Amino acid sequence: MVKHWRLILLLALVPLLLSGCGKPFLSTLKPAGEVADKQYDLTVLSTLIMVVVVAVVSVIFFYVIVRFRRSRVGENTIPKQVEGNKFLEITWTVIPILLLIILVIPVVLYTLELADTSPMDKKGRKAEDALVVNVRANLYWWEFEYPDYGIITSQELIVPTDQRVYFNLKASDVKHSFWIPSVGGKLDTNTDNENKFFLTFDSKRSKEAGDMFFGKCAELCGPSHALMDFKVKTMSAKEFQGWTKEMKNYKSTAESDLAKQGEELFKEKNCLSCHAVEPNDKRAEAARTAPNLATFGERTKVAGVKEANKENVKAWLKDPDSIKPGNKMTGTYPKLSDSETNALYEYLKGLKAESK
């Protein structure tokens, strides 16, 4: 019997240990913006209400068990019945209603406030007043378009802090779900309609997070659903304006001889039919079937999941399916030799927005 209790105790500790796993600032319990703060407050409020209810019911439950135990009242004693007691009937009807009212009022108020995306649809809207980002989810990558600036990026969302950023969400293939746990809870991306919402990124808490947050797909979409990650880089409004100017003036140029070989291979293998290498991609959405590779050389991840070192980039180029199963890149080009992947790596790592 003692062994069974030890096993039960051990199993009970497993969830506690697992709760400590995960990445920094990939948790709803570390809110870093206006939306996340409100959602966290509602979580705390609802949890407190439930804790109070469970505590009161548990106290009454154990009191009855102890007070009317057989050894104390005897075999044939029947406790006083309270059926039809008006005071008790009113009490256990009114209290739940009051608790629901306490919970419903902030939920409704916050829902209406967080659903207000009218500033993004105003005529004459300026990006400085209401920045809009079009998010397009694909199997298994993300595209971010800044329509006010004519900029398109992939896998890394760049946003200013301390202001509302408005999002148009849609999907190009199947249903996905856009989620940045630390900044605001998720919203689906659909193929047949657009969803809209806004998020804010608090500058102080962004600094604490190293100006970096992590986003995920929160809707099961295929074999690499768990690998459909993206990164969010935050910066001040002034720095953001500087970034947009850099991106507008961005030109992809290969410098070394090996990089130039990689550029020629990139064209020869017809990579440009799917990938763009500059952020001002004018093609229609239907033609943008693969991630935009502008600033690839500044990214810390390849395919959103592996460290962007030479070994991993070459492994991705040789066999994408070994890193992200089900991706659409696999089998679209002939097998590459080591010399070809070396040249392509050199070219791709040179794609940067930084001044050259």
From Swiss-Prot:
Topological domains annotated Cytoplasmic: 67-87
GO-annotated molecular function: copper ion binding; cytochrome-c oxidase activity; heme binding
Binding residues annotated for Cu cation, in chain numbering: 176, 217, 221, 225
Lipid-conjugated positions (S-diacylglycerol cysteine): 21
Protein location: Cell membrane
Cofactor, free-text remark: Binds a copper A center.
Topological domains annotated Extracellular: 21-47, 107-356
Gene Ontology biological process terms from the UniProt entry: ATP synthesis coupled electron transport
Broad EC category: translocase
Membrane topology: Multi-pass membrane protein
Spans annotated as Cytochrome c oxidase subunit II: 21-257
One CC-aspect GO term: plasma membrane
Domain Cytochrome c: 258-356
Family (UniProt): Belongs to the cytochrome c oxidase subunit 2 family.
Protein name: Cytochrome c oxidase subunit 2
Protein's organism: Bacillus subtilis (strain 168)
